[in-house]
Swiss-Prot record:
Catalytic activity: 2-C-methyl-D-erythritol 4-phosphate + NADP(+) = 1-deoxy-D-xylulose 5-phosphate + NADPH + H(+)
SUPFAM superfamilies: 1-deoxy-D-xylulose-5-phosphate reductoisomerase, C-terminal domain, Glyceraldehyde-3-phosphate dehydrogenase-like, C-terminal domain, NAD(P)-binding Rossmann-fold domains
Species assigned in the record: Oleidesulfovibrio alaskensis (strain ATCC BAA-1058 / DSM 17464 / G20) (Desulfovibrio alaskensis)
Keywords on record: Isoprene biosynthesis, Manganese, Metal-binding, NADP, Oxidoreductase
Pfam hit, one: DXP_reductoisom
Described purpose of this protein according to its UniProt entry: Catalyzes the NADPH-dependent rearrangement and reduction of 1-deoxy-D-xylulose-5-phosphate (DXP) to 2-C-methyl-D-erythritol 4-phosphate (MEP).
Pathways involved: Isoprenoid biosynthesis; isopentenyl diphosphate biosynthesis via DXP pathway; isopentenyl diphosphate from 1-deoxy-D-xylulose 5-phosphate: step 1/6
GO biological process: isopentenyl diphosphate biosynthetic process, methylerythritol 4-phosphate pathway involved in terpenoid biosynthetic process
Entry protein name: 1-deoxy-D-xylulose 5-phosphate reductoisomerase
Residue numbers binding NADPH: 27-30, 53-55, 140, 142, 221
Length: 407
C-alpha cells in the first residue's frame, strides 16, 4: 500500500509457520484475547515470550501453560514472586523493567511482536521492535500518537512491518487491500459513542467510575474504557490514522455508530465506500494480524444481519465530548502537542479512576496542559524517544499540579 507507515511482511514471513510470538502486555485485555486465538490453532504459533505489568499470578499461569523461554515483568521486585509461582522444573529467563520489554521486543527468534502495553509505557518496546526490523502487531496506539514519524522512519530503514490491531484501523487496513491509497477520498472512523451517548451535561457532572467503565459493546481494560467514554480513544485513533495511512487530518472523519458492527470505512474517489463489518470482538483483528496473510478461525460467532436489524449513524457531540476536538488540535499543532495530549489524558484518567476528579474535569485538565505547553518556549522537535519521554514526564507533573490547583 503506497503511503502506508511501513513495508508489508515479505513472502518468507507470510509462509512462516509455526510463528514465534512475543506478547508484550499478555495479562491485559488484548494479551489474553491473543492467547485465546493461539489456543484455537496451537500448531500455527509458538509462544517465545510473555510480558505482564502487574498481574503476576495470571502471568505465571500463562507461562505454565505455554512454557516460553522468556518472561518479563515491569517491577523488578515481582521477579522473585513470579519465579516462585512457576511449575517445578520450568526455569525461564525472567527480565525486568522497560529494558526487559525492549530486550523481548528485539529477540532474534521472534517472528511477530504484539505490542499491547497500555499507554505511553508501550513506546520504548514498540520502537525497539521497529529498530530490530520486526513485524509488529500494534495494539498500543499511543506509540503512534507520540512517535508516529519516528516509527515510520525506522520501519522504512529496517524493513519492520506494522499490522494494526485496533479494530478500526484493522478495518481500514483490510478495506485498503487491493486498492491504491492515492484514490482514497477519506477515512471514516466509527465510534460507539460510549456509555454516555445521548446524555446531557447535568448527567455527566456526576457520573461514577463504574458507569464510565460500563461500555455498551466492547470488553476492554479500564483506561481504554474511560477513553471511550470521553471519546479520547477516537481522538487518539484519528492521530493514529494520519500516521498509519499518511492521511491529511481533514481526510479523517468520525461518525458515531452505536451498534459497533461497522468497524470503519474507506471512501474512494468514485464515490464508493468499503466497510468492514463484524461482531464486536477483538479476537477478529488480533487473529488477522497474528496470522497474516492467513485467515484464521477465531471462535467468534459470525454476524447475523437479521438479528442486527438496523444500523444507525450520528455526528459526535463535540460540545459534551471535547476530547475528540482536542486530539485534532494536538495533531494539527504538532510541536509535541500530541505527547502533551496523551500524557495529560493518562494522568486525568487515572485521577478520575481514583475518584480525585470528576468526569468532566478530564478534558478540562487536558486542555489546560496543552495551553501550558503552548505558552512555554520550545527548542525541540520531539522526534526521538528521549525527548518525547522527557516531555511526557514533564507534562505528567504539570497536569498533576494543575489538578491540585483545581482541587
Amino acid at each position: 500500500m503506497n503511503g502506508y507507515i511501513s513495508p508489508l511482511p515479505d513472502a518468507a514471513w507470510n509462509s512462516r509457520f509455526p510463528r514465534s510470538l512475543v506478547l508484550l502486555g499478555s495479562t491485559g485485555s488484548i494479551g489474553t484475547s491473543a492467547l485465546r486465538v493461539v489456543e484455537r490453532q496451537p500448531e500455527l504459533f509458538r509462544i517465545t515470550a510473555l510480558a505482564g505489568a502487574r498481574n503476576v499470578r495470571l502471568l505465571a499461569r500463562q507461562a505454565a501453560a505455554y512454557r516460553p523461554p522468556h518472561l518479563a515483568v515491569i517491577n523488578g521486585n515481582a521477579a522473585d514472586e513470579l519465579a516462585s509461582l512457576l511449575p517445578a522444573g520450568y526455569r525461564p529467563r525472567i527480565h525486568t523493567g522497560q529494558e526487559g520489554y525492549e530486550f523481548l521486543a528485539a529477540l532474534p527468534e521472534a517472528d511477530c511482536v504484539l505490542s499491547a502495553q497500555v499507554g505511553a509505557a508501550g513506546l520504548r518496546a514498540t520502537v525497539a521492535a521497529a529498530r530490530a526490523g520486526k513485524t509488529i502487531a500494534l495494539a498500543n496506539k499511543e506509540s503512534l500518537v507520540l512517535a508516529g514519524g519516528l516509527i515510520r522512519r525506522l520501519c522504512h530503514e529496517t524493513g519492520a512491518s506494522v499490522l494494526p490491531v485496533d479494530s478500526e484501523h484493522n478495518a481500514i487496513f483490510q478495506a485498503l487491500q487491493g486498492h491504491d491509497a492515492a484514490q482514497m477520498r477519506r477515512i471514516i472512523l466509527t465510534a460507539s459513542g460510549g456509555p454516555f451517548r445521548g446524555r446531557d451535561r447535568t448527567f455527566l457532572q456526576s457520573v461514577t467510575r463504574e458507569q464510565a467503565l460500563n461500555h455498551p459493546n466492547w470488553s476492554m481494560g479500564a483506561k481504554i474504557s474511560i477513553d471511550s467514554a470521553t471519546l479520547m480513544n477516537k481522538g487518539l485513533e484519528v492521530i493514529e490514522a494520519c500516521h498509519l495511512y499518511n492521511a491529511p487530518l481533514e481526510k479523517v472523519e468520525v461518525v458515531v455508530h452505536p451498534q459497533s458492527i461497522i468497524h470503519s470505512l474507506v471512501e474512494y474517489n468514485d464515490g464508493s465506500q468499503i466497510a468492514h463489518m463484524g461482531t464486536p470482538d477483538m479476537r477478529i483483528a488480533i487473529a488477522y494480524c497474528l496470522g497474516w496473510p492467513r485467515v484464521m478461525h477465531t471462535g467468534v460467532e459470525p454476524l447475523d444481519l437479521l438479528s442486527v436489524g438496523s444500523l444507525t449513524f450520528e455526528s459526535p457531540d463535540i460540545s459534551l465530548f471535547p476530547c475528540l476536538e482536542l486530539a485534532r488540535k494536538a495533531y494539527a499543532g504538532g510541536n509535541g502537542l500530541p505527547v502533551v495530549l496523551n500524557a495529560a489524558n493518562e494522568v486525568a484518567v487515572d485521577l478520575f479512576l481514583q475518584g480525585a476528579i470528576a468526569f468532566l474535569d478530564i478534558p478540562r485538565l487536558i486542555e489546560a496542559a496543552m495551553q501550558a505547553h503552548d505558552a512555554a518556549p520550545h527548542q525541540n522537535m520531539y522526534d526521538e524517544v528521549e525527548s518525547i519521554l522527557t516531555l511526557d514526564k514533564t507534562t505528567r507533573r504539570v497536569t498533576a499540579d494543575l489538578a491540585g490547583a483545581r482541587g
